A protein has these predicted regions:
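OB-fold/S1-family single-stranded nucleic acid-binding modules
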Residues: 1-13
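Electropositive polyanion-binding surfaces
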Residues: 14, 18-27, 34-309, 313
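A short, hydrophobic C-terminal helix/tail in secreted or cell-surface proteins
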Residues: 312-320
Length: 320
């Protein structure tokens, strides 16, 4: 016999359809009371003792770049040119593990949720907002604890030196992708507003182009697709669908996160330590064969296997 478990809301409540979907997937917005109580015991700011043993980067010009709607600012960057002409790039990630201890109620809840869930009009966070939007968010002009990959990169895009360490930073600005894209496009008003970091943005553009060029030479593919965003009104009803345009700012951050991820992965691989890697597995033979058959219909002959593809383009007609 069926019984009432919970009342989600009235059918006409704003956003009730989204809440229904979340409930049907066992994605719970509310946190258990014991998790919230533990979150309340987390301080609002680091203490002096928290900073001990950490590399102090608060004097570096460091800033975040995110979407305009972002609230949990979990990564930041700094960049400068060294005397030898190389770039120093720092990628800083909020040190959540300093506050969320293994086996704690916060840790168990985060393990159960696995990730933050982004839907049309809201975010269901992995951690309570006191942490995700507070001390674990790299908000401007406040001290924040971070894990950092600091890399020296030469003019060919090679990481010649790196340091991976615990740090303390203080971001200068909370930048949006549109702000940075405007500055790159020559918007003088934005350049004046954020003049302190304009030299950093110039360096970012230069380094991004170097890193992107190196990736393409290594055989990387550019899947630069536009993402749709559903616009809703105050009642939570969809009113429009717009395309998120990816500018150079978005691609720069992507380049910097990629080089940081590669550097960290290589670092721990050389140490032969247990580590979690995200890799692209070799394609299945039947999928490769389907692709070869499909490509041949366009006059392109492909030689190789799933282990090593060597392709020679021989189109029967010119392509642009």
């Amino acid at each position: 016999m069926a019984s009432l478990v919970d009342v989600v809301g009235h059918v006409n409540d704003p956003g009730i359809d989204v809440l229904e979907v979340l409930e049907s997937m066992d994605i719970v917005s509310e946190f258990p009371e014991k998790v919230l109580e533990e979150a309340e015991r987390v301080p609002d700011a680091p203490t002096e003792s928290d900073l001990e043993g950490r590399l102090d980067l608060r004097d570096e010009i460091t800033f975040t770049i995110d979407g305009v709607d972002a609230k949990d600012l979990d990564d930041a960057v700094h960049i400068k040119r060294l005397k030898n002409g190389n770039f120093e790039l720092g990628v800083h990630i909020a040190d959540v593990s300093y506050y969320v201890k293994e086996g704690s109620e916060l840790d168990k809840e985060a393990l159960n949720r696995a990730t933050s869930v982004y839907v049309t009009d809201r975010v269901v966070p992995m951690l309570p907002e006191r942490l995700s939007n507070g001390i674990c968010s790299l908000n401007p002009n406040v001290d924040r604890l971070t894990q950092s990959a600091i890399m020296e990169i030469d003019a060919k895009g090679r990481v010649v030196k790196h340091t991976i360490t615990q740090t303390v930073i203080k971001t200068t600005f909370r930048m949006t992708y549109s702000d940075v894209n405007d500055i790159i496009a020559g918007n003088q008003e934005k350049a004046e507003q954020f003049k302190k970091i304009v030299p950093s943005i110039d360096n970012m553009v230069q380094l991004h182009k170097i890193l992107e060029s190196m990736r393409f030479k290594r055989g990387a593919l550019n899947f630069d697709t536009n993402e749709a965003k559903i616009m809703v009104n105050k009642e939570g009803r969809p009113v429009d669908i717009v395309l998120r345009q990816r500018g150079i700012a978005e691609r720069m951050i992507e380049s910097f996160m990629l080089v940081a991820n590669e550097t960290v992965a290589e670092h721990f691989a050389k140490l032969n330590l247990p580590f979690i890697y995200r890799i692209h597995e070799e394609p299945k033979a039947e999928k490769v064969q389907k692709f070869i058959d499909y490509a041949s219909s366009f006059g392109i002959r492909i030689y190789g296997t799933a282990l090593s593809l060597i392709h020679i383009s021989e189109p029967t007609r010119p392509y642009s």
